[in-house]
A protein has these predicted regions:
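NAD(P)+-binding Rossmann beta1-loop-alpha1 motif at the extreme N-terminus of oxidoreductases
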Residues: 1-33
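Flavin (primarily FAD) cofactor-binding/catalytic cores of flavoenzymes
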Residues: 7, 16, 72-74, 163, ...
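Internal alpha-helical scaffold of NAD(P)-dependent oxidoreductase catalytic cores
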Residues: 23, 77, 118-190
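Short, hinge-like loop/turn segments at secondary-structure boundaries
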Residues: 30-33, 101-104, 143-146
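Active-site-adjacent segment of FAD-dependent monooxygenases/related oxidoreductases
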Residues: 34-40, 156
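Rossmann-like NAD(P)(H) cofactor-binding subdomain of soluble oxidoreductases
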Residues: 38-42, 46-138
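Oxyanion-binding "anion nests"
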Residues: 193
């Protein structure tokens, strides 16, 4: 995602570690796809989240079990209007937030055992997103896109906001399919099935 969004001329910062970070800083981040290779050299790359200033949009693409370890650092990325799009597989920590009904605001203990994410990340800044593409790091600084192009997204309360429409437009500008859904939770189950 970072390479495609940066290729559209947007300012992009990435968090990486070790040899991957070193390669990005030295040569840029390369995306290898079936018909083309694109290298983004206009990225800010760091391994220290707190080195970055507040962002307009944060794409949280960590494994669910990795998020709690960085929840304090994520706060540095949040300004008053920052939106965070979550790209985890499975049931997300925010599943019962803004849902209503008898399960409203329950903590999903299997992915957020101590309720840290539930309590520390304001659900008003979260937009849910389901990542269908498959990709892998083939060598430091090189991402191989294997298949898939869909990133359906939606507000946790099912509303059709201007911010989710703007994110969809950004993703589509970068060449992704990004349909806005009024029930993002159903899409989670569709992917899990």
């Amino acid at each position: 995602m970072a390479v495609r969004i940066a290729a559209c001329g947007h300012d992009v910062s990435v968090i990486a570690r070790g040899p991957h970070l070193k390669a990005i800083r030295e040569k840029g981040l390369k995306l290898v796809e079936a018909e083309q290779e694109v290298v983004a050299t206009n990225l800010v790359a760091t391994d220290v989240i707190r080195d970055l200033e507040p962002q307009d949009l944060v794409l949280l693409a960590l494994k669910a079990h990795q998020i709690e370890a960085v929840v304090d650092d994520l706060q540095a990325l949040f300004g008053p209007e920052t939106v965070m799009v979550t790209l985890q597989n499975g049931i997300p920590w925010w599943y019962f937030q803004k849902l209503g009904g008898p399960y409203a605001d329950r903590v999903v203990r299997t992915v957020d055992p101590n309720g840290e994410l539930f309590n520390r990340i304001d659900p008003d800044r979260v937009v849910g997103c389901i990542a269908y593409p498959a990709a892998t790091i083939t060598e430091p600084g090189v991402i191989q896109h294997i298949e898939g192009n869909r990133f359906p997204l939606g507000e946790l309360d099912g509303s059709e906001s201007s911010r989710v429409a703007d994110i969809s437009s950004l993703f589509e500008e970068a060449g992704f399919k990004a349909r806005v859904l009024t029930d993002i939770r159903s899409e989670i189950w569709l992917k899990l099935w």
